[in-house]
Curated annotation (Swiss-Prot):
Name of the protein described by the UniProt record: Large ribosomal subunit protein uL11
One Pfam match: Ribosomal_L11
Function of the protein: Forms part of the ribosomal stalk which helps the ribosome interact with GTP-bound translation factors.
Any single Gene Ontology cellular-component annotation: large ribosomal subunit
InterPro entries given in the database record: Ribosomal_uL11 (IPR000911), Ribosomal_uL11_C (IPR020783), Ribosomal_uL11_C_sf (IPR036769), Ribosomal_uL11_CS (IPR020785), Ribosomal_uL11_N (IPR020784), Ribosomal_uL11_N_sf (IPR036796)
Subunit structure and binding partners: Part of the ribosomal stalk of the 50S ribosomal subunit. Interacts with L10 and the large rRNA to form the base of the stalk. L10 forms an elongated spine to which L12 dimers bind in a sequential fashion forming a multimeric L10(L12)X complex.
Organism: Methanococcus maripaludis (strain C5 / ATCC BAA-1333)
The keyword rRNA-binding is assigned to this record: yes
Amino acid sequence: MAEQVVEILVSGGKATAGPPLGPAIGPLGVNIMQVVQKINDMTKDYDGMSVPVKVIVDTDKRTFEVEVGIPPASALVKKELGIATGAQEPKHQVAGNLTMEQVVKIAKMKQDAMLAYNLKNASKEVIGTCVSVGVNVEGMTPKEAQKAIDAGQFDSYFN
C-alpha cells in the first residue's frame, strides 16, 4: 500500500481546490472536490481559524482519509475574545483580556497536543501564547498571570 501524506493549514470550512491543497493532492489521483468537501465538512466549526489538516492518500486504491487537528492556541485565544488579529505591538498594546475560565477552556482543548503534564501547566502555556498575541489575563500581563498561578492565586480553577 503506497500512502502519501499531505499536511496543510486551511481556513475552517473554506478549503478550495486551489493552492495549497490542489497542487499537492491533484497528482495523487483522488477526486480533489471530494477531498475539499470532506475537509470543509470536518472544519466548519472552526470558521475563520487556521486549522491543521492531514490528508492520507492511498495511491493504489485511490482512496483518502482526512484528519483534522486542533487550531493553534493563538487562533483559539483570538476566537475566544472575538477579535480578528492580535495587537500590532504586543508589548505596548493590549488586544483584549481573557478570564481564567477562558484560559482553562482553551487549555483543555489543546492539552492533548501540549507537552504539559497537567491542566495548570497547560494553562500557563496558553498564557505564554497570550504574550505574542498581546492579550492580558484577568487584567494582568501574561507574565504576571503566570506568576500568580505559581503563587497559587488561581488554584481553584485547576481542581
